[in-house]
Amino acid sequence: SSKKLYERGMTSIASETVCYPGKMVHGHIQSLIDKGVKTIFYPAVTHEYREDKTSDNHYNCPVVISYSEIIKNNVPDLKKKNIKFINPFMTLNDKENLKDRLCQVFSYYFADLNISKSEIRDAVDAAKEEEFAFKADIRRAGEEAVEKIQKENLKGIVLAGRPYHLDPEINHGMPELINSLDMAVLTEDSICHLAQVQRPLRVVDQWVYHSRLYKAAEFVKKYDNIELVQLNSF
């Protein structure tokens, strides 16, 4: 992302109060249209994978859940240029449900591609396997970083946020700034598995990324040389 990309989609932003990452979506969609893309698949994902089985729920935030509807109804070039815009509602938590939903979507929108249901189901299995392997790599890197911090008596910052905070345009260079102060940077998903929150909480723990945040805060409590900074884009 970039400021220039953001500006490309400014005219279709429906509300000034939506978060900056939400506004950035307009620029990305306009960029795809300008490149001549004729089909855009932008599902509305209601639930994430439930990483913490003790949480109250595992919703995505309302913007993530419904923003494809905003795009569909507020980006005029989608209709002007006859773009096939596909935004089915689905959940990522139930693998079998996801397989069934994708089979429905592909049979309806992509019948001409002749993709079999078995191919779709195998693809979901492979994707989930890779997702879990990726998350395991992140956790392993977090454990190694914590070990190094403790062994060498360094200072560290858990930079907690949402996945879009990996985007330099969204995080505004905060990871690099913290590194320049001779402090290690860890993401909340690299260490949150090392702690458990004490329940009940005084809040409804229903958002997946907040669930990580609470566990990350619990983790930081145990260390004098590790602090937590929360990134927020609202």
Task: Please identify what each model-predicted range represents.
Residues 1-234:
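An N-terminal assembly and electron-transfer interface module characteristic of large anaerobic redox
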